[in-house]
């Protein structure tokens, strides 16, 4: 028994002294391999008498199990140490250097800025936000909005159509955010007061048009809304958005399939200088389209036009951003030019504040 105790101490010391897995494996083989010292003693059990074998056998098996357990613990420890060394050696600092000023950590795109401004203004007037899919069906984009068959907007030169799918349906990229009005009226009971900012798509590209552009539409549905309410709403929005105490607006007759009567709205401005100034001057600039929701549209969503009425409007976010902040070319919005963004972009503290003294100039 003394030999077994001495052997266990020697093996334990060898395991503790092992500094790498290769040395540790050598110790294991020397103890538990086919010709290892413990294995040889286990083989010798067959030559002992029964009484002695019953005494020595459990002791050797216990030794074998303890050595194996110590070996596993030591192996796991060496592996963790090796991994930590490797991680320390291969560490790459992916963080950016500290900027000189916390205000220079990035710029907010003008479109994002203007969308937040629009949402803040209308939210202050009791409107909620609505959203819908960019890929639409013909029904929601045209039919439900009173676009008759053969309407020019259905033609390929104006609308991005997808190939016909397995069901025989031909979907498209929405040409306006008006489909969200239909989806909202189908799901939500009146009264309804929503604004719908989002991306829209049309085949057009020049200095003031883009195949993908941003639009915001609004919808009011109840039993009492009139054109007078609509006119007040547009005037209030323009004063808040362009930050002027008063504006003059004119409403010109127009045509939209989904409104009747339909109007286009011009706002008074001064274009004599390099930047458009609102609330003064003798010029007029078209700013949005609007009108009372067409009775056929109300019928398409299950509303009785003899009971319910309302108005809708829409404007290009990119366009009013250009007008407010003096950007000459719409295409630069999507060029991903950091120099342009650094010049026209906004800091986080610029979003949005409509009260004197709160702007971070």
From Swiss-Prot:
Organism domain of life: Bacteria
PROSITE patterns: AA_TRNA_LIGASE_II
Main location (coarse class): cytoplasm
The reaction(s) this protein catalyses: tRNA(Phe) + L-phenylalanine + ATP = L-phenylalanyl-tRNA(Phe) + AMP + diphosphate + H(+)
One GO term describing the cellular component: cytoplasm
InterPro entries assigned to the protein according to its UniProt record, in alphabetical order: aa-tRNA-synth_II, aa-tRNA-synth_II/BPL/LPL, Phe-tRNA-synth_IIc_asu, Phe-tRNA_ligase_II_N, Phe_tRNA_ligase_alpha1_bac, Phenylalanyl-tRNA_Synthase, tRNA-bd_arm
One MF term in the entry's GO annotations: tRNA binding
Enzyme class: ligase
Record EC number: 6.1.1.20
Assembly behavior: Tetramer of two alpha and two beta subunits.
NCBIfam families in the cross-refs: pheS
PANTHER family assigned to the protein according to its UniProt record, in alphabetical order: PHENYLALANINE--TRNA LIGASE, MITOCHONDRIAL, PHENYLALANYL-TRNA SYNTHETASE
Family, per entry: Belongs to the class-II aminoacyl-tRNA synthetase family. Phe-tRNA synthetase alpha subunit type 1 subfamily.
Protein name, per record: Phenylalanine--tRNA ligase alpha subunit
